[in-house]
Amino acid sequence: MRKHLGGCWLAIVCVLLFSQLSSVKARGIKHRIKWNRKVLPSTSQVTEAHTAEIRPGAFIKQGRKLDINFGVEGNRYYEANYWQFPDGIHYNGCSEANVTKEKFVTSCINATQVANQEELSREKQDNKLYQRVLWQLIRELCSIKHCDFWLERGAGLQVTLDQPMMLCLLVFIWFIVK
């Protein structure tokens, strides 16, 4: 009786651990009711300023301070002026199926240079330290971006695809221990 009860508990724990309950969205009736919803602007009403914000390589400036090492002098300059620097880059170069990390980072840097050409050339005349910190920041922001399919190529277990295999493995181990 004790082993049977332990097996039931093991089965319950396995089902809870490997079920996709966390990915299920709880949806009520509110998503069907469209009361007090604002009408989305038509594409003819979109201004050039709005279009410029979402083009690939555009800077995201929200005033956040990032944890990046720029060297002693660069760190002091960044600490004092971090609000002037971007804290993100709009870029999604994952549309190509076989893009590598190096190619992705290079195209992100190139797109950022094209999108922000005016700001990069204007600031270049003013301050060399600003330029050095900005370019290092751009390289860092592009290198931390990733494509989801890179994770699928990795050696780790894919959670969604390997759940049945893990469940079978646990049941097999349970039968061996039993």
From Swiss-Prot:
InterPro entries: Doppel (IPR021566), Prion/Doppel_b-ribbon_dom_sf (IPR036924), Prion/Doppel_prot_b-ribbon_dom (IPR022416). GO terms for cellular component: external side of plasma membrane. The keyword Membrane applies. Glycans are attached at residues 98, 110. One of its GO terms (biological process) is acrosome reaction. Disulfide bonds join 94-147, 108-142. Strongly expressed in testis. Detected at low levels in lymph node, spleen and ovary. Keywords: Amyloid, Cell membrane, Copper, Disulfide bond, Fertilization, Glycoprotein, GPI-anchor, Lipoprotein, Membrane, Metal-binding, Prion, Signal. It is found in: Cell membrane. SUPFAM superfamilies: Prion-like. A lipid is attached at residue 154 (GPI-anchor amidated glycine). Belongs to the prion family. Required for normal acrosome reaction and for normal male fertility. Can bind Cu(2+). This is Prion-like protein doppel. It comes from Ovis aries (Sheep). The lineage of its organism: Eukaryota, Metazoa, Chordata, Craniata, Vertebrata.
